[in-house]
Amino acid sequence: MAKRIIYNENARRALERGIDILAEAVAVTLGPKGRNVVLEKKFGAPQIVNDGVTIAKEIELEDHIENTGVALIRQAASKTNDAAGDGTTTATVLAHAIVKEGLRNVAAGANAILLKRGIDKATGFLVDRIKEHARPVEDSKSIAQVGSISAGNDDEVGQMIAEAMDKVGKEGVISLEEGKSVTTELEITEGMRFDKGYISPYFATDPERMEAIFDEPFLLLTDKKIALVQDLVPVLEQVARAGRPLVIIAEDIEKEALATLVVNRLRGVLNVAAVKAPGFGDRRKAMLEDIAILTGGQLITEDAGLKLENTKLESLGKARRITITKDSTTIVAEGNDVAVKGRVEQIRRQMEETESSYDKEKLQERLAKLSGGVAVVKVGAATETEMKDKKLRLEDAINATKAAVEEGIVPGGGTTLAHLTPELEVWANSNLKDEELTGALIVARALPAPLKRIAENAGQNGAVIAERVKEKAFNVGFNAATNEFVDMFEAGIVDPAKVTRSALQNAASIAGMVLTTECIVVDKPEPKDNAPAGAGAGGGDFDY
């Protein structure tokens, strides 16, 4: 395909036009009085969102060069989303402001490479300052504040996430599901839970609720298919003599073996239930080993030279209670703390080594299940459109609270960045010179941009508000919900330091790339052929 090549100022201006379009579409959502954006969907109802990265992903322009600008700034939003899970709109607004300021200097003849170096040094200084100003999150009140700000000033959601964090701890997983009612509910599971239920409904011990509940059961874990009942007979006899229930977790149980277990269960010979192993492939084996460590048992696998028919009672796991429904199993075990701690450390090391975000997520889930912490927020809404919007807001809120626990909190509402402007100017003037100094001052002029936009979305004069905030103490900022200047910590308007830091780093990185662009190569749009007369009108020889 033929290419179109654009140089110098023309290239940068075309990128800027694309960035302007995206930044404006995203910036309308910023702050407590930010509006929503409606996204048309090819299939189904339109989606109403208030989430920067979701809007950025939807924007595709006709002009290839402008579209390149959109793609670059979209990267700032999605990288911030990957790192901190929130702050995507802030990253977009910041990147836009740095690009705008920077392009003026490049057009006036400044050296773009030295400007970029100044921008990078300024970012390094600001990251350190954010770290110094961050306060650790100590109580659930602070967590609730972070959660409610990220969910669009919804105090109920903040409270719910704080409660979930309190129950499942730092390592725990808080997952989102679409609820069945209009209200949003929180469900907390004690113990390890996985999404596999009993193989046959005949295993249910409570016919009304269709649940199988076992107290003090033995647990047989194997990664093979159980085809012959003869393999199980020795274990079943030992368990029957011990007079305790047995739960079998295996890859699968074939009809013959399953029928025998069901008959024994119905006749009251043996209280037994069978469940398919969770996961698949290597992950299935790892999860079975997790369950074995949690219950103090052994995974019966031929890789380790262990056979089902030779299994002794000592190899079986023991749990305090196991609850099985048609689509989930919950194991509550205790007393194997040392082994579990060792396993948790091992999973943590794997998380540090892996590059894949998917693997990281799965390892985090395993970590949470071992630590005994899984909370499910069931999102409730009257319509599907509202449900999707709520789900995105809740996702941001959960990510923001986790980020706050990791690196602490700073004053929110764009306040921190605005207050750092004078600090950066003083530092840059005494440590940098020439065009590097200009690069750092570009960042200083761009820092109040998120605060200005929050004020403008609330119907105020952004530039005036930003100047007034800079004159006040570090913790004092502009509360756009009430149009007052308040102590942000006391008012509960806080941002996770990690979110502010990630937004700044990614914005500066992308802006630096745009400023140092000298040439763009894009596909040349193909001329549209005029369709021949009569085409598409339906041939006369066919009946339709």
Curated annotation (Swiss-Prot):
GO terms for biological process: protein refolding. ATP binds at T29, L30, G31, P32, D86, G87, T88, T89, T90, G413, N479, A480, A481, D495. Its main location: cytoplasm. Keywords: ATP-binding, Chaperone, Cytoplasm, Isomerase, Nucleotide-binding. GO terms for cellular component: cytoplasm. One of its GO terms (molecular function) is isomerase activity. Residues 525-544 are annotated as: Disordered. The keyword Isomerase applies. InterPro entries: Chaperonin_Cpn60_CS (IPR018370), Cpn60/GroEL (IPR001844), Cpn60/GroEL/TCP-1 (IPR002423), GroEL-like_apical_dom_sf (IPR027409), GROEL-like_equatorial_sf (IPR027413), TCP-1-like_intermed_sf (IPR027410). It comes from the Bacteria. Its EC number is 5.6.1.7. The keyword Isomerase applies. It is found in: Cytoplasm. It catalyses: ATP + H2O + a folded polypeptide = ADP + phosphate + an unfolded polypeptide. Pfam families: Cpn60_TCP1. NCBIfam families: GroEL, PRK00013.1, PRK12849.1, PRK12850.1, PRK12851.1. HAMAP family: CH60. Together with its co-chaperonin GroES, plays an essential role in assisting protein folding. The GroEL-GroES system forms a nano-cage that allows encapsulation of the non-native substrate proteins and provides a physical environment optimized to promote and accelerate protein folding. Belongs to the chaperonin (HSP60) family. This is Chaperonin GroEL 1. The lineage of its organism: Bacteria, Bacillati, Cyanobacteriota, Cyanophyceae, Nostocales.
